[in-house]
Amino acid sequence: VNFTFKDKRISGILGVVPARERSFVEEMKNFNFPESRSLKLKEVMGYDKRRLVEPGVCVSDLSVFGLQHLFDRGLLARDEIDALILVTQSPDYFMPPTSNVIQGRLGLKQDMMCMDINQACAGFVIGLIQAFMLLEQESIRKVVLINADVLSRKTSPKDRNIYPLIGDAASITVIERDTRNCAIQASLKMDGTRNEALMIPAGGMRLPSTAETAVLENVGDNNLRAKDHLLMDGSAIFNFVQLEVPPLIEGLLTRAGLPIDSIDYFLCHQPNRFMLQKLADKMKVPYAKMPNNVVERFGNGGSTTIPLAITLNLSDKLKSEQEMQTCLAGFGGGLVWAAMLIRLGRLTCCEIIEYP
């Protein structure tokens, strides 16, 4: 599916990461695996530090903290928010929507729209597409997009495949109308036949959580995981990214009439260092144009990795008047892969703060 939008822009991005930090070296003892092989994994995949919420901290807590930061500094006013979109796979509750919980905790106006979207690693691009569609309405002038997950709470400390990878984070992106006729183009594809490559098997209506679904099982290579935990078929995801993402981006560039070297930065979801390096190699994109340092500092926070990459690497540049042509690309659970061409700059906020 292809999208084209005009007269809209991102005006600010805030990243929120928990203060609690863990290191891969400290956690190696949890894995029933030779230390030498764990260290090799660290080197190849880029595992190092990651941020985790304390027990009991939820998506709404990170989100409310970040929005309050923007309110307190005059970067956003409560009554300006006409729509609030939350993209998460770890909501506070099945019901009510966590976006409504956030609205209530902050005392936002009733004349607004709240919406939860259950999407994973492509959720930043999908959230932006939804925000731009809402801004087509006369009554909506400013949208807040929150991407947030606390999926560390759904991982097994004994599963080396996924546990050292996952981090918790939130991002808040402010999207509004723009007077300049600057085109934004996006492409989106989905393949539900491969939905089991990245999933949490138990906990929903199909397989409710029970004492049995909490039992750890040896799932191979001495990794222990329960059905209540997040699982990832690493080889399937790797092959999916290498095969599907490059042609999607190439097709988007062709549709926009832009050569690949006209893109200042490719800001992609960051599953791990190795996978992103291989994607850059496949597309013949210089590493300097594809930032790849989020996982080693914060962990893989799902749909937050693109906004964290922006705030971590481009903060000073994006606060200037000069705009940059960027390509955003998200890919993962669903399976879903999405890309967007958008000019970024003139941001009133582009920073990362810590949730205490």
Positions of predicted regions on the chain:
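Short beta-strand segments
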Residues: L14, V87, N118, V143-D149, ...
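Claisen-condensing/thiolase-fold acyl-transfer catalytic domains that form or cleave C-C bonds
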Residues: S60, V64, S90-P91, G104, ...
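Short glycine-rich phosphate-binding loop at a beta-alpha junction
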Residues: D79-V87, I260-H269
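Short acidic, glycine/serine/threonine-rich loops at helix termini
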Residues: R22-S23, M95-P97, T155-D159, W337-L341
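Acidic-glycine-rich active-site phosphate/pyrophosphate-binding loop
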Residues: E35-K42, Y93-G107, L145-L151, A214-D221, ...
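Condensing-enzyme catalytic core mediating Claisen C-C bond formation in acyl metabolism
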Residues: V1-P55, D159-N239, L243, P247, ...
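Flexible, glycine-rich active-site loops centered on histidine and acidic residues
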Residues: E136-A170
